[in-house]
């Protein structure tokens, strides 16, 4: 079962989920994460206390809203738009990442948090309200 997460960066909060993969659940085990966020185009990335190798989910084919683990830097990456390596609107990581999760809803709102240095990711039982509302209908 995926792990629901809350991502807070400055005044911006989004919800997401970490997948049921080995790497996704390894990330879930190190929550909560408080880190200094780096920015690379429309991507936040930051080191977390986890060492993993590339796995069966590893790819450079990323979509807006994907969350990846980048083994060379022991870093988590949150993609919310094009990166410097992009040729279109999809993000492109510097090298392969393990897909470990995704943002629920509009990840592009994270653009409002650019210039902020701190990020917090924690487990939550709550889903983004609009998602919960659509499930009730």
Spell out what each predicted region is.
Residues 1-34:
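Long, hydrophobic N-terminal alpha-helical segment
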Residues 19-23, 30-128:
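Glycine-rich active-site loops that engage anionic ligands at enzyme catalytic sites
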Residues 127-137:
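Short, basic, low-complexity termini and linkers enriched in Ser/Thr/Gly/Pro
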């Amino acid at each position: 079962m995926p792990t629901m997460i809350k991502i807070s960066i400055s005044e911006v909060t989004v919800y997401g989920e970490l997948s049921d993969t080995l790497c996704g659940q390894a990330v879930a085990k190190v929550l909560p994460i408080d880190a200094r966020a780096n920015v690379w185009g429309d991507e936040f990335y930051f080191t977390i206390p986890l060492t993993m190798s590339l796995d069966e989910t590893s790819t450079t084919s990323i979509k807006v809203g994907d969350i990846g683990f980048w083994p060379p830097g022991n870093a988590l990456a949150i993609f919310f738009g094009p990166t410097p390596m992009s040729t279109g609107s999809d993000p492109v990581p510097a090298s392969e990442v393990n897909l470990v999760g995704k943002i629920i809803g509009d990840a592009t709102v994270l653009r409002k948090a650019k210039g902020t240095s701190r990020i917090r990711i924690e487990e939550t039982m709550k889903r983004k309200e609009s998602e919960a509302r659509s499930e009730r209908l």
